[in-house]
Regions:
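Extracellular glycan-modifying ectodomains
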Residues: 1-176
Length: 176
């Protein structure tokens, strides 16, 4: 977050490192890289409290660096239970779908509303689909998408990368 005030009051005891790392945008190297960039992708494991602060942060970033920021939503591919998956017969295994938490969906809706669809990428929707019915666990060729429900495997990252070219926020940057 690029704020002119401390976020310490918002950070829970489980995230003390955030307070110590607050101010990353004050690095002259980071600021120069942002200035030189045509587009900057901002990704985080967003929580409700920092998603609520994003509009203020984004306004500060735009004022300082211009309108070049694309916000990537929080990722949630459900709970991945490797032992359970391995115990599932192969044909059924590849049909497995997980539920995405309503909290994650709500945070992504909040982010999309705050920044607009031209500056937002809903990663969960790209991987899982916008239906909300569930999120597949495997790629079409049987490779695991995520090993922990929040981080992509190499195969999952490839699949996400191939779908990014059709996202308006990314497509516009690729057309220059």
């Amino acid at each position: 977050l690029f704020l002119t005030r401390s976020i310490e009051a918002h950070v829970t005891n489980s995230y003390p490192v955030l307070c110590r790392q607050d101010g990353w945008y004050n690095s002259s190297t980071v600021r120069e890289l942002i200035r030189q960039s045509d587009q900057v992708w901002v990704a985080s494991a967003w929580q409700a409290w920092d998603a609520a602060l994003l509009p203020e942060s984004l306004a500060n970033l735009r004022r300082e660096f211009g309108d070049k920021f694309v916000i990537f939503g929080t990722k949630d591919f459900g709970i991945i239970d490797i032992k359970k998956l391995l115990a599932t017969p192969v044909p059924q295994r590849y049909q497995t779908q997980n539920q995405i938490s309503e909290t994650s969906r709500q945070i992504n809706r909040q982010l999309a509303q705050a920044v607009g669809t031209t500056h937002f990428v809903d990663v969960s929707d790209l991987i899982c689909g916008a239906s909300g019915r569930g999120c597949r666990v495997f790629t079409p060729d049987g490779r695991l998408l995520s090993y922990d429900g929040g981080h992509l495997t190499v195969e999952g990252a490839r699949e996400l990368g191939s779908s990014l070219v059709d996202v308006p926020a990314i497509k516009n940057a690729l057309s220059f």
